[in-house]
């Protein structure tokens, strides 16, 4: 029970820090966001599946949704490549720009649908038992 209490306490502190961070970056321009590594943090959060962070930051500063890496892959590209379903579902909350995000190609000419067709990370596949279940999960991502 003490361990759960410590986790909740830590989570509460992290939420306070996130709220403070959101207040601070809400008025930042693109150059300030780059200098603060906010774009990199968004991409890392997408890779790790930290939905709460991405959602709070995008509400504070919608420009953060346009974060891209050196391969011109954005938040939702990273979510798909790492099979982070909850992050990908945030796309439904994006007003008016869904189609632009969905159709945007990376440096290799791949859009979100192409990335969904790639095989997921081996660590993700190893956690599932049986080839049939792995294939089923990959087909669900492609759909």
Summary of predicted features, one role per range:
Residues 1-143:
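Acidic, Ser/Thr- and Pro/Gly-rich low-complexity regulatory segments
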């Amino acid at each position: 029970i003490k361990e759960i209490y410590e986790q909740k306490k830590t989570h509460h502190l992290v939420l306070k820090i996130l709220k403070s961070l959101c207040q601070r970056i809400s008025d930042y321009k693109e150059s300030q966001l780059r200098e603060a590594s906010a774009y990199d943090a968004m991409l890392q959060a997408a890779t790790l599946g930290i939905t709460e962070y991405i959602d709070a930051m995008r509400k504070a500063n919608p420009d953060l949704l346009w974060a891209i890496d050196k391969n011109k892959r954005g938040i939702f590209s990273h979510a798909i490549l790492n099979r982070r379903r909850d992050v990908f579902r945030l796309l439904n909350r994006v007003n008016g720009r869904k189609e632009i995000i969905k159709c945007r190609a990376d440096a290799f000419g791949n859009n979100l649908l192409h990335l969904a067709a790639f095989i997921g990370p081996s660590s993700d596949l190893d956690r599932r038992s049986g080839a049939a279940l792995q294939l089923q999960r990959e087909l669900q991502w492609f759909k």
